[in-house]
Amino acid sequence: MEKYIMSLDQGTTSSRCIIFNKKGEVVSVAQKEFTQIYPKAGWVEHDPLEIWGKQAGVAGEALNIARISPEQIAGIGITNQRETTVVWNKRTGMPIYNAIVWQCRRTAGYCDELREKGLDKTIKEKTGLMLDAYFSATKIKWILDNVEGARELAEKGDLLFGNIDTWLIWNMTKGKIHVTDYTNASRTMLFNIHELKWDEELLEILDIPKSMLPEVKPSSCVYGETDEILFGVSIPISGDAGDQQAALFGQTCFNAGMAKNTYGTGCFLLMNTGEKAVDSKNGLLTTIAVGIDGKVEYALEGSIFIGGAVIQWLRDELRMVKTAQETEKYATEVEDNNGVYLVPAFVGIGAPYWDSYARGTILGLTRGAKKEHIIRAALESMAYQTHDVLKAMEEDSGIELKALKVDGGACQNNFLMQFQSDILGVEVDRPEVVETTALGAAYLAGLAVGYWKDRNEISQNWAISRSFAPAMEDEKKEKLIKGWHKAVTKAMDWEDKE
């Protein structure tokens, strides 16, 4: 009887289930979107019960599509939108509030208060993260302080916290297992990434009872088994990692200096730094890449707020293109950018600049500038931003980038990938299987149950669909990068500070 691995990929807008075979190929996919809740400006929530319902639904659907029985699943891997926070009553199993999503800014004011007390340095040293409303810690505190009776229940030991991975595992095991992995724990702003444990001092500062927190385990191990009510049989739950870390693993970035970029709405860059937690001097995050083989490995992470979203903007707001795919055709119809630069700082600019007062700009316009030049400049902006983050990573880690592995929607744009390679001066590799996030979770699950022997076997699965080699002269490259940095300087500090 042929065996498979099931991957549950719980994202920000949809719940998916992908089933993989031994070669790491996709056998079936099922997906359901769920509701985005916006109670106030800047607030974002999800319904945890809806997420669990949809996730269980797509798991059954993926089995049906693949025409395989639950007995053929050797293990289940979970990957999830990181930082999103669920608090529930362990006696009833019911959430006491909606899940507060990573994008939600409601606790920004409280983060400012902590910053005024000088706690940002403590938090960075212990967790590797910047003090920000993005991470789970202040979201948990908000629920405890604002939901009636929450604090009393927490003090009594009746409340549990989890990111989405923890919430799914708890439901899949009918409340038997309250667990997370090192990668997800490292995104809570409560986990000491050097000592590998929940940090007592941070829990005290934020007034969060330790009894709420899940046990932290490796990213690849058997956490427990699914309750039989779910599939009719018990299946080991054996892999767990946050989405970006899962993608790094799925791209087989197993050695220090290997990096991947996910070109989504935003771009997420992670570089493996091995067993060394590199402290960033350039505004990058230090995070746990994976917990496996009795140790943890670390990564540097840089986020680009506006990646593929700049193409959506060209399509929906400026109506320059009908589909994202058309951008490649327009970009190649002109020889160069004609001196035009587009800095997509619509919501400020992220790593390594970190200026929330920057705003979007189009610079270098002359009478000869056409729509094609603006479209080309928009695509190029993704490559320039990626270049800036990777240079910061090289500087912090002291490791020179050899090649960049890519995934996400915009990696299908051949013009962008070639330009990315030219600007970086290294090879850009697009894999055959671009479902790298789900694949990473599947690999972690499969390793724990012996479906794959080791990372060497997995590395052999990784196949290049297309490789892009740098073909631009150094002088031209330096001139373009200089122009980009000049454009970024003009975009910065634009919005008036209140």
UniProtKB/Swiss-Prot annotation:
Reactions catalysed, semicolon-separated, are:
glycerol + ATP = sn-glycerol 3-phosphate + ADP + H(+)
Q: What is the lineage of its organism?
A: Bacteria, Bacillati, Bacillota, Clostridia, Eubacteriales
Annotated SUPFAM superfamilies? Actin-like ATPase domain
- Return the InterPro entries for the record: ATPase_NBD (IPR043129), Carb_kinase_FGGY (IPR000577), Carb_kinase_FGGY_CS (IPR018483), FGGY_C (IPR018485), FGGY_N (IPR018484), Glycerol_kin (IPR005999)
GO biological process annotation, one example: glycerol metabolic process
Q: How does it assemble?
A: Homotetramer and homodimer (in equilibrium).
Q: What is this protein called?
A: Glycerol kinase
**Which Pfam families does this chain map to?**
FGGY_C, FGGY_N
Q: Where does ADP bind?
A: 12, 16, 265, 308, 409, 413
Leading EC class: transferase
Annotated function: Key enzyme in the regulation of glycerol uptake and metabolism. Catalyzes the phosphorylation of glycerol to yield sn-glycerol 3-phosphate.
Pathway field of the UniProt record reads: Polyol metabolism; glycerol degradation via glycerol kinase pathway; sn-glycerol 3-phosphate from glycerol: step 1/1
Listed binding positions for sn-glycerol 3-phosphate are 12, 82-83, 134, 243
Q: Which residues bind glycerol?
A: 82-83, 134, 243-244
Q: Which Gene3D superfamilies match?
A: 3.30.420.40
Give one GO molecular function term: ATP binding
The gene designation is: glpK
What's the source species for this entry?
Clostridium botulinum (strain Kyoto / Type A2)
Cysteines paired by S-S bonds: none
Coiled-coil residue spans: none
GO CC term, one of those recorded: cytosol
Q: How is its activity regulated?
A: Activated by phosphorylation and inhibited by fructose 1,6-bisphosphate (FBP).
